[in-house]
Amino acid sequence: MGVPRCFPLEQFAETIATDWPAVKQQLLEGTYRPGPARRKSIPKPDGSLRHLGIPNVVDRVIQQAILQILTPIFEPHFSESSFGFRPKRNAHGAIKQIQTTIRSGYRYCVDMDLSKFFDRVQHDVLMMRVSRKVRDRRVLRLIGGIYELA
């Protein structure tokens, strides 16, 4: 590909300035493929490990660009009661929602953690749903490539 993917973050401005034309061309042609993710395992409170795939800097920038485009497309369809990883939503908002719900008469709450949720997402179903709203095959191929490396 000719585009270096691993470099110190401090070199980002210099590297992206020289390499962006090649990255842009690959994105436009639909030939860009994300680089391999760096693997890292971090301990969970119960002692088990959570395995992470950390993308390189260029791939992170591209993922952020995709997020900025997809968020306004999909955000209106998400539950008002969902607060995780959503714009303008956080733990404080979730607590306020819980307090409002309690004040309205509810007395029970379910707390759950979907074990290994992202490991169990059906890739074909996810991509089918995304493709209903995203028609550009280059974007779909890019999302699929990112998903496969995660």
Label every model-predicted segment.
Residues M1, A37-R39, L67-I73, A150:
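Short, compositionally biased low-complexity segments
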Residues M1-A17:
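Non-catalytic, polymerase-adjacent accessory regions of viral genome-replication enzymes
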Residues M1-R5, P45-S48, E75-S79:
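A short, surface-exposed helix-loop junction/capping segment
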Residues A13, S41-P43, G53-P55:
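Short, conserved beta-strand segments within well-ordered enzyme catalytic domains
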Residues A13-Q25, V134:
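A short, contiguous, amphipathic alpha-helix enriched in charged residues
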Residues Q26-G30, P34-K40, P45, H77-S81, ...:
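Conserved polymerase palm-domain catalytic core
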Residues L49-F78:
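Conserved pre-motif C helix in the palm subdomain of viral-like polymerases
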